[in-house]
């Protein structure tokens, strides 16, 4: 399965980028994962012609079998850089229409990205997107700095849950892709 994985933060060092890199490495035999960076997109501005970087990003979303988004939580929601990218992606081409989407996330806070993920699911399910959002188990890892070791690996229990989480997503994908 070809996944376009969106790093939902514009931070130079992002634990969500670290999480996606771990997922890419861990599931290398299962998925073909390409990372996309919201930090490479300009801030959304209504009435402005879609920039080439946005068109390229939208094509990667459209060409993927499914989209994986890793988001932190900022002020009980998603970061403004991710929201801006979503504004671009809902303003013209609508590449998320009927696209299976799976959301993960991590944060330095104990609750992980719980509220950010909840808000993101609401946005992606709205009429401007129409994505098929996976609503099974949730992966929202808290206290990110304590989770990754010096090689970017995660604890065995976390990896076991991540395996289960993606097994559930694969079942969802098989169902919605019929």
From Swiss-Prot:
InterPro entries for the chain: Flavoprotein-like_sf, FMN_Rdtase-like_dom, NAD(P)H-dep_reductase
GO MF term (any one): FMN binding
Catalysed reaction, written as an equation: a reduced flavin + NAD(+) = an oxidized flavin + NADH + 2 H(+)
UniProt KW keywords: Flavoprotein, FMN, NAD, Oxidoreductase
Knocked-out gene: effects: Cells lacking both LJ_0548 and LJ_0549 completely lack the NADH-dependent flavin reductase activity detected in wild-type strain, and show a 40-fold reduction of hydrogen peroxide formation upon exposure to oxygen. Reductase activity and H(2)O(2) production in this mutant can only be restored by in trans complementation of both genes.
Name of the top EC class for this enzyme: oxidoreductase
A GO CC annotation given for this chain: cytosol
Function: Component of an enzyme that catalyzes the reduction of free flavins (FMN, FAD and riboflavin) by NADH; the reduced flavins produced by this reaction likely spontaneously react with oxygen, yielding hydrogen peroxide. Is responsible for the major H(2)O(2) production in L.johnsonii in the presence of oxygen. Cannot use NADPH instead of NADH as the electron donor.
Family designation: Belongs to the NADH-dependent flavin reductase family.
Name of the protein: NADH-dependent flavin reductase subunit 1
Originating species: Lactobacillus johnsonii (strain CNCM I-12250 / La1 / NCC 533)
Record gene name: nfr1
């Amino acid at each position: 399965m070809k996944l376009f994985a969106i790093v939902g933060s514009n931070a130079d060092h992002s634990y969500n980028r670290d999480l996606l890199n771990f997922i890419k490495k861990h599931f290398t035999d299962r998925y073909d994962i390409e990372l996309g960076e919201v930090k490479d997109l300009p801030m959304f501005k209504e009435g402005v012609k879609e920039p080439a970087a946005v068109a390229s990003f939208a094509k990667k979303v459209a060409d993927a079998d499914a989209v994986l988004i890793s988001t932190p939580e900022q002020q009980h929601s998603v970061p403004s850089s991710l929201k801006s990218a979503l504004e671009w992606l809902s303003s013209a081409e609508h590449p998320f229409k009927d696209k299976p989407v799976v959301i993960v996330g991590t944060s330095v806070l104990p609750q992980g990205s719980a509220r950010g993920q909840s808000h993101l699911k609401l946005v992606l399910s709205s009429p401007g997107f129409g994505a098929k959002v996976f609503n099974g188990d949730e992966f929202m890892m808290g206290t990110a700095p304590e989770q990754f070791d010096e090689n970017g690996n995660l604890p065995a229990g976390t990896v076991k849950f991540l395996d289960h989480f993606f097994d559930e997503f694969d079942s969802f994908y098989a169902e919605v892709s019929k």
